[in-house]
Swiss-Prot record:
ADP binds at T12, R16, T266, G309, G410, N414. Sn-glycerol 3-phosphate binds at T12, R82, E83, Y134, D244. Keywords: ATP-binding, Glycerol metabolism, Kinase, Nucleotide-binding, Transferase. Key enzyme in the regulation of glycerol uptake and metabolism. Catalyzes the phosphorylation of glycerol to yield sn-glycerol 3-phosphate. SUPFAM superfamilies: Actin-like ATPase domain (SSF53067). One of its GO terms (biological process) is glycerol metabolic process. It comes from the Bacteria. The keyword Nucleus does not apply. PROSITE patterns: FGGY_KINASES_1, FGGY_KINASES_2. This is Glycerol kinase. GO terms for molecular function: ATP binding; glycerol kinase activity.
C-alpha cells in the first residue's frame, strides 16, 4: 500500500528530506547542512559530491526514523536551489570543479560581453530572463573557458551539465537518466520558453555544446526509478521536479491566474501565476515557467531579492548581535521604529526590480542613538521593503491588484516581519499551517504523476491557513517609510 511521498528539498545551505502523507501533512523530516565555499570575493561554490552524499543520507535517515519502508513510498519529488551549476564527467561521475552557486558573481564580465554584443533583447524575448550572473548559462561558459580540459571534454561529448535536480536524478538512477524539468530549464538563460526547447542561437552565442544539456520534461512526470539498493527494498519512481520557488508556488496551491506567493529563505522570492500568458515585464521582473503538467505549461512573473534570511545570518555570525534567528522578533519588538536606520542587503548586488550587479550592502541613517534593536529591526524591515518593490512592479506588469499574499519559508514564522509585511504592502498576508510548502510542492507534483493525488482540486481542498495578518498602518506613515527605503537603495547602487 502506497501511503507516502518523499520530498527532497535541496537548498542553498542544507539538504532535507521530508515524508508527507495523503493529507499533505509532514510525517518525518531530516536535515544536514553542507559547506559554503568562498574562494574569492563575490564567488560562492558548493561541493556537488557532498550535496549528493548528504541528500541521499537524509533520505535514508527519514526512512529509518519513521519506520516507513520503500514499498510504502508512492514517489520521490525533488525541489532544488535553482541556477546552481554542476558540470561533470559522465564516465567517472565526478564534477570537473565545484558547483557554481546562484549567488556567485564571477561571471559579471561574461554578462557585460553578452550585453555589448547586443543580445539583451533577444535573450529577454526568448528566455524571459535578463542577462545576469545569477543564471546558469554564463556559469557553464565560465567552467568551459577556465577549467583545464573542460572544453575539450565537452566537445567530445564527455561532460554533462545539470542544475541540482538533474545532478540528483542522475545519481539516483546511477547515471541512466539525464533530465530536467521545464522550471529549472527556464532558469538557465539557454531555454526558449515559447518553443520549450534549448535555443541553438543562445548556445552558439555562449559557445556551449548542446550535447551537455539534459532532456527537458514536465514538472510532474516519471523520469526514472531509484536502484533497489539505493534506499534498500524496492525501486521508487522519481516523479516530480521543480525549482524551489516554483515548487513553493505549487505547494501553496497558487493554481489560478493572479495568485501569488512570497518565499522568505536565503533570498526572497515572489512569484505570480500568469496562467497561459507570457507577460514580458517592463519593470525589471523575470518571466518564467511556473510548472508543466501533462501537455500544459503555466507561466509566472518573478521578482527575486538575493539576500533575506542571509542578512539575519550575517547579524548572527558576523556582527554577533544575536545568538539565534528567532531572537530578531524579540529585539524588533523592543522599539517602535528603527530610529531612522535603513539597511540595504545588497551583499551580492541587487535583484528585481533594480538588477544592479555592482550595488553593495549599506547601513544608513546611523546616529549615536542607534542601538542593536534598531539595526535588527532595520534588517527585518528591509526584507519587507524588497518584497514591496517586487509587488509594485508585478502589479504594473500584470495589471492585477493582489488581494492577498501567501507566504512560506523560514522567516515567515517571524510574526513581527509578517505584520510589517502586511502593513507596508497594505494587503492581508496568509501563513499556512504547513510551512514546508517548497517540499510539499515537489511532493504534490510527484504524487500527481503517479496518481497518489488525482487532480489539483484534491490538493486545494487539503490546504489550511494558520494565521492571517491584516494591514494596520496609516497610509501617510506607509508612504514616508517607503520613501526612506527608496532613498537608501539609491545610495547603495553602482558602488563596486
Amino acid at each position: 500500500m502506497k501511503k507516502y511521498v518523499l520530498a527532497f528539498d535541496q537548498g542553498t545551505t542544507s539538504c532535507r528530506a521530508i515524508l508527507f502523507d495523503k493529507d499533505g501533512k509532514k510525517i518525518e523530516t531530516a536535515q544536514q547542512e553542507f559547506s559554503q565555499i568562498f574562494p574569492k570575493q563575490g564567488w560562492v561554490e558548493h561541493d556537488a559530491m557532498e550535496i549528493w552524499g548528504k541528500q541521499s543520507g537524509v533520505a535514508r535517515e527519514v526512512l529509518e526514523r519513521s519506520g516507513v519502508s520503500t514499498q510504502e513510498i508512492a514517489a520521490i519529488g525533488i525541489t532544488n536551489q535553482r541556477e546552481t551549476t554542476v558540470v561533470w564527467n559522465k564516465n567517472t561521475g565526478r564534477p570537473v570543479c565545484n558547483a557554481i552557486v546562484w549567488q556567485c558573481r564571477r561571471t559579471a564580465d561574461i554578462c557585460d560581453a553578452l550585453k555589448e554584443k547586443g543580445l539583451s533583447d533577444s535573450i529577454r524575448k526568448k528566455t524571459g530572463l535578463i542577462i545576469d550572473a545569477y543564471f546558469s548559462g554564463t556559469k557553464i561558459k565560465w567552467i568551459l573557458d577556465n577549467v583545464p580540459e573542460a572544453r575539450t571534454l565537452a566537445e567530445k561529448g564527455e561532460l554533462l551539465f545539470g542544475n541540482i535536480d538533474t545532478w540528483l536524478i542522475w545519481n539516483l538512477t546511477r547515471g541512466k537518466v539525464h533530465v530536467t524539468d521545464y522550471t529549472n530549464a527556464s532558469r538557465t538563460l539557454l531555454f526558449n520558453i515559447h518553443t520549450l526547447q534549448w535555443d541553438k542561437e543562445l548556445l552558439k552565442a555562449m559557445d556551449i555544446p548542446e550535447s551537455m544539456l539534459p532532456e527537458v520534461k514536465p514538472s510532474s512526470y516519471v523520469y526514472g526509478y531509484t536502484e533497489e539498493h539505493t534506499f534498500g527494498g524496492s525501486k521508487i519512481p522519481i516523479a516530480g521536479a521543480a525549482g524551489d520557488q516554483q515548487a513553493a508556488l505549487f505547494g501553496q496551491a497558487c493554481f489560478e491566474e493572479g495568485s501569488a506567493k512570497n518565499t522568505y529563505g536565503t533570498g526572497c522570492f515572489m512569484l505570480m501565476n500568469t496562467g497561459d500568458k507570457i507577460i514580458e515585464s517592463e519593470n525589471g521582473l523575470l518571466t518564467t515557467i511556473a510548472f508543466g503538467i501533462d501537455n500544459s505549461v503555466k507561466y509566472a512573473l518573478e521578482g527575486s531579492s538575493f539576500i533575506a534570511g542571509a542578512a539575519v545570518q550575517w547579524l548572527r555570525d558576523e556582527l554577533k548581535l544575536i545568538y539565534t534567528a528567532h531572537e530578531t522578533e524579540y529585539y524588533a519588538g523592543l522599539v517602535n521604529d528603527t530610529n531612522g536606520v535603513y539597511f540595504v542587503p545588497a551583499f551580492s548586488g541587487l535583484g528585481a526590480p533594480y538588477w544592479d550587479m555592482y550595488a553593495r550592502g549599506a547601513l544608513l541613517g546611523l546616529t549615536r542613538g542607534a542601538k542593536r534593536e534598531h539595526i535588527v529591526r532595520a534588517v527585518l524591515e528591509a526584507i519587507a521593503y524588497q518584497t514591496k518593490d517586487v509587488l509594485y512592479a508585478m502589479e504594473k506588469d500584470s495589471k492585477i491588484n493582489l488581494k492577498s499574499l501567501k507566504v512560506d519559508g523560514g522567516a515567515c514564522a517571524n510574526n513581527f516581519l509578517m505584520q510589517f509585511q502586511s502593513d507596508i504592502l497594505n494587503v492581508p498576508v496568509l501563513r499556512p499551517y504547513e510551512k514546508e510548502t517548497t517540499a510539499l510542492g515537489a511532493a504534490y507534483l510527484a504524487g500527481l504523476a503517479v496518481g497518489f493525488w488525482k487532480e489539483q482540486g484534491e490538493i486545494k481542498r487539503i490546504q489550511d491557513i494558520e494565521r492571517e495578518f491584516r494591514p494596520d498602518m496609516e497610509e501617510e506613515k506607509r508612504k514616508t517609510l517607503y520613501a526612506g527605503w527608496k532613498k537608501a537603495v539609491e545610495r547603495s547602487m553602482k558602488w563596486a
